[in-house]
Amino acid sequence: MSKAFQLIDRFSEDVDFAVISGDMSGNQVKMLLSKLMKEVTVGFAEDKSFADISKGSKYRKQAFSYDALVGLDVSVNPIPSRIIVEISAFANPFPYEKRTIEPFVTTYLKKQHLEDVASQYHLEPFELNVLSLKQTLCEKTVSLIRFSMSQDPLASLSSKIRHFCDLNALMTIKDLEEYVCGVEFVRDVETLVKHDQAAFDDPFGWKGLKDLTQSPLVLDFENLWEALTPRYEENLSAIAYREIPSSERVKVSFLKILDSLRTINLTKSSG
């Protein structure tokens, strides 16, 4: 959202890839994910201290460290000198569109009229297939619903606190705000929930969710958000390079999404 669409003004330490596996066998997918992880992390050293590692047959998540030339302590630079790479064959990466990606360093060099330096270090803009904004909105919404079904919704939602900020940014686009209020959004969320219920076993109550109003996020959002607000303000302020949206503004945006979510009945839609 920051690099392809310039919608959010914050740094990120993770890179997410979705693999379109088609008719590939399970073993072929596993080998492809392993090969991709090696190719996109050439020159980096794996961070063995990273605990949330996964090397499954359809999902890989690893952290890689790099040399930080600017020696800032954690109080000044809270973003660790590492990149978290996630490659998934679980995802449903449709629809997508081709977007031009320009590194932050390249943007700076252009402003300084140093395009030759960008070329020297192979920092020219490049194209990538990027998930559409509608699908991004649905995926972040469903992710929050799924994580809210854990035994400790507050802790789980805290780990996904940036999704709330991202959803607020998406809701500033008039077409997306209108999309959320329509039947297309309801249908797309229903489809994605069913897809993710088939793909993910955790948390415990996720697969048995039949009505989104059973989700603590939908059922008790205002109280949850009040408890999450300090985490939102602390976490986002640390990685943003412009002022972050107020917690009240983020709350109002998500309430609009909730209005549509409350109309979804998974049992009815599957019958």
Task: Explain the meaning of each model-derived region.
Residues 17:
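Beta-strand-loop-alpha-helix segment that lines the small-molecule cofactor/substrate pocket
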